[in-house]
Amino acid sequence: MSDGCKYFEDFKVGDVFEFKGTPVTKEEIIEFAEIYDPQAHHLDEEAAKDSILGTFCASGWHSCAMLMRLICDTYLNEAEHIGSPGVNEVRWRKPIVPGDIFHVTRTVKAAKGVPGQGDRGMVQVFFDVKNQDGKPLMTMDCFALYRRREPLGEV
């Protein structure tokens, strides 16, 4: 599944694209946590009950990684993507628990050329991630560079 946006010129401010993932599993939450974020509430259901969140859940960083995988599988790997200079903001709204399914809405916030680099453009997008019940899980505001279909001037 792709949104048809391959080159910089394909991204229009205000465009919305929706996609979804598969259920998050307890096993993948633990596997990620054991390697990257070994806090009790990501590793043990009983210990999680006494945490500030009160429930066993995925690491926020795991949620970012899951979103990135969905982005790659859904459209990025088919696009003329060059890279990203960074993320403006990530907000974790609700714990991600086993069985949650990411329902993602991507909105194009800005699309501008890069001064002195006529072969590419910068796209700012906002991701709004909800679960299968429409409850907000996370948001992310970020930038990505894409090749132009037709380079402008010297590169």
Regions found by a protein language model. Name each.
Residues 3-12, 92, 96-155:
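HotDog/MaoC-like acyl-thioester-processing domains
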Residues 1-85, 151-155:
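Hot-dog-fold acyl-thioester-processing enzymes
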